[in-house]
Design a protein with these regions (language model features):
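Alpha-helical transmembrane segments of multi-pass membrane proteins
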Residues: 1-262
Length: 262
């Protein structure tokens, strides 16, 4: 089966891409001198590559150019870049995975879009509004990341397998349970960005727009990467992938900057 040119793996709820039968190995045809090989590359794979190229070019233009024009380079730019890029990638990975997971539980993607997105945005807003309290209560931005990662693991491994047993509940009860499961994760996710921006503002205020741009670029890049990732490994793996992303981002947070004062 691995040597077969087409993807014939069974479709399930974790990888609901019944329209996708091609393999990423066919991307090599894009660089072939044979026009027949180039024409065989499926449209979806072409689209992913095209989007990555366009967004990558925009990142170089909109992020790196302003950074070079700054009169003073921000300290430890790589660590700051890893932190804000990780926030953009991780947030969108969590959001997309939760939308798909709760779409099954709520019965329709539109319900998931309404309930999950509203819950996540409201919880993130609360986390951003009360970021100093959240970060201070947990003892620092890194401990917020540890808590968020623990919640993601607990819900993925313990809570989500139980959701099919609750499909007979009324819609209001399922929506309420969705809100309760999304709320703590969203509050933690919302505390990261304002904390990082506030710390950067104290140290290098002129680098704040650059950091915002890094986060924005990777937030736009993340959906494309998330689709490619989930098609290959599934939505469950996409949600779990947010764990190392946030851990790396938290470890990239400069230890000399007091997170609890954000």
């Amino acid at each position: 089966m691995r040597a077969y040119p087409l993807s014939i793996a069974p479709v399930d709820d974790d990888r609901p891409f019944f329209f996708r039968y091609s393999s990423w190995r066919e991307l090599g045809g894009l660089f072939s001198a044979d026009p027949v090989m180039r024409a065989r590359v499926p449209p979806m794979e072409r689209s992913v590559v095209a989007l990555l190229i366009v967004i990558g070019a925009a990142a170089l233009l909109c992020v790196q150019l302003p950074l070079r024009l700054l009169s003073r380079r921000p300290p430890r730019p790589r660590r700051h870049a890893a932190f804000f890029a990780g926030l953009g990638l991780g947030y969108m990975a969590v959001e997309i995975a939760l939308l798909q997971r709760f779409g099954l539980f709520l019965g329709h993607p539109n319900y998931a879009l309404s309930v999950v997105l509203a819950s996540l945005l409201m919880a993130s807003g609360l986390g951003a509004l009360h970021a100093p309290r959240v970060v201070g209560a947990l003892g620092g931005i890194r401990f917020v990341a540890y808590a968020v990662c623990g919640l993601i693991l607990a819900e993925t491994l313990l809570a989500f397998p139980l959701l099919p047993r609750l499909l007979t509940l009324p819609f209001a009860a399922r929506a309420g349970l969705t809100f309760l499961l999304v709320l703590p994760i969203g509050v933690g996710l919302g505390a990261f960005l304002p904390t990082g921006l506030e710390a950067l503002k104290r140290d290098t205020p002129e680098a704040v727009p650059w950091a915002w741009g890094v986060n924005g670029v990777f937030s736009v890049l993340a959906p494309v990467l998330s689709v490619a990732f989930s098609i290959t490994w599934g939505m469950r793996a996409l949600l779990l992938a947010a764990v190392p992303i946030y851990l790396v981002a938290a470890l990239s947070y400069p230890a000399s900057e007091p997170a609890s004062r954000a």
